[in-house]
Amino acid sequence: MGLVETQAIVLQTYKLADADKIVLCMTEKSGLVRGVARGARRLKSKFGASLEPFTLIQLTFFEKETRELVTIKGAEIVKSYFHASGSSEAFEGLVYILELVREFAPPHHADEKLFRMLRACIDFLAGAPEHAAAVSAYTELWTLKLTGFLPEFKSCGHCGVPLGETFRGQRFISHEGVLWCQDCRKGGSQPLGAEAYRLLSSTRKRAPAEWSLEFEGASEESMRVVSETARRLVRRALEREPRAGRASAAPDA
């Protein structure tokens, strides 16, 4: 507790009283933080444009153990992604990515991997808006993985037979994201080809740009299965649809 200095990405802001803001940030050292920035809405505020969404900042805040809201003392822009809002694809993708982190990241729980993943995805998407659908799916899978909601995709959910990359039989996947071998598959499961399996299990081994190119080079069926699986797992974890939509890589079945 006390004074904290950390890099942060501004996720969302709210008006407070006549001149203040409440700012929601994903920070490198403290996880998801909600803070009050006094005077942030004044014309000559010391914060300037640093507390706008889609901005990477060096943040200084004061934290008390008994209070959920921190007090923001200073913020300096490291990098702004606001220019990306000029592209509808990039804007929608950024909004969706920020929402995923806002929904899944627990408050005041440091997760440097989640912060680095978020920064890498925003960096790539801001410069390559045409990859919005792929980056959204990548972010879904990584966020699910880091917060414990992504299945391992290593073995049959019933008999336990290994279903990794060396498996030569047919895999099936349920609506809950559980893998089945051919002998154990249940009604409602769909085939999971080798290409789609590699995409689902390779996010942690690939940077956003590399995975996006691999995803977009796959068959339309593989893109559809991966995209739908990631989306279903997000819905299942949240127990509802995300408030912000995301671009689809392929038509829904």
Question: Model segments located where?
Answer:
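Non-catalytic alpha-helical scaffolds and adjoining flexible linkers that form interface surfaces
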Residues: 1-253
